[in-house]
Amino acid sequence: MKRKKIALIGSGMIGGTLAHMIGLKELGDIVLFDVAEGLPQGKALDIAESSPVDGFDINLTGANAYEAIEGADVIIVTAGVARKPGMSRDDLLGINLKVMEQVGAGIKKYAPSAFVICITNPLDAMVWALQKFSGLPAQKVVGMAGVLDSARFRYFLSQEFNISIKDITAFVLGGHGDSMVPLVRYSTVSGIPLPDLVKMGWTTHEKIDQIVQRTRDGGAEIVSLLKTGSAFYAPASSAVAMAEAYLKDTRRVLPVAARLSGEYGIKDMYVGVPVVIGAGGVERVIEIDLNDNEKSAFEKSVNAVKELCKTCSALAPNLKE
């Protein structure tokens, strides 16, 4: 059986980490692409030379031309500028929008049947623009945000309760920014909702509020610690989980930035919601019931994304809202 082909557009910290993780899982042959000459080739060779030690059999190549992504089954986009201390994700918009236009054109020409995962920030606006620029069906273009934000939420909860991360389910709605909505009511420990655990004395409302805020600030916390860049291990793991669900048709329920077509009262916008990912891409959007507080927080998050998309349209007139 022919091996799958996975193209990684952007060979920085996330791109290199993605290549290594995908290699270890043997999900398919890998093409690392970057505009910087030598960077994708060097990383591809370095990771390939680890394969005899780690015992994985895949082909790894590096390239500076979009022709190399031709026929890719999955494309993961990390190209663009990363955050530095003091920057918000939104500060990157103007620069990275131009990058998305180039990437979208490359995908449209060489890999129009691919499943595309965008990681570039500001995420919700960039994946919206990338889908427009590429012309791919909306169900085949998604943004990686919710899996990462939910993972951070789950990790912080596991630390608070001192229990296995495997027993915690939690997810985050909305945009990938300061207005994201970690859903406390829908988060559980072995099926026990967080509000019930507060009643049982496991934690307090104040501590849960602190964890929610730390989740919102999760990316900024790492940026301030690293000082020279942003997170790359957890974002890469999150994107691999999404790619694997598509390639293996596991129909996993994952929170991703997906284009909505009336769900949650929203049309033609990418926002973080739980979806089913399988061989068809986004096979179903799960519309959960929100109370008044959750609705209000979600609407605030959606409005923040809407403003970013308006800015994108002003900067690139060929984008239509």
Swiss-Prot record:
GO terms for biological process: lactate metabolic process; tricarboxylic acid cycle. GO terms for molecular function: L-lactate dehydrogenase activity; L-malate dehydrogenase (NAD+) activity. The active site is at 176 (proton acceptor). SUPFAM superfamilies: LDH C-terminal domain-like, NAD(P)-binding Rossmann-fold domains. It comes from the Bacteria. Disulfide bonds: none annotated. Its EC number is 1.1.1.37. InterPro entries: L-lactate/malate_DH, Lactate/malate_DH_C, Lactate/malate_DH_N, Lactate_DH/Glyco_Ohase_4_C, Malate_DH_type3, NAD(P)-bd_dom_sf. NAD(+) binds at residues 10-15, 34, 96, 119-121. Keywords: NAD, Oxidoreductase, Tricarboxylic acid cycle. It catalyses: (S)-malate + NAD(+) = oxaloacetate + NADH + H(+). The keyword Iron does not apply. Substrate binds at residues 83, 89, 121, 152. Catalyzes the reversible oxidation of malate to oxaloacetate. Belongs to the LDH/MDH superfamily. MDH type 3 family. This is Malate dehydrogenase. It comes from Bartonella bacilliformis (strain ATCC 35685 / KC583 / Herrer 020/F12,63). The gene is mdh.
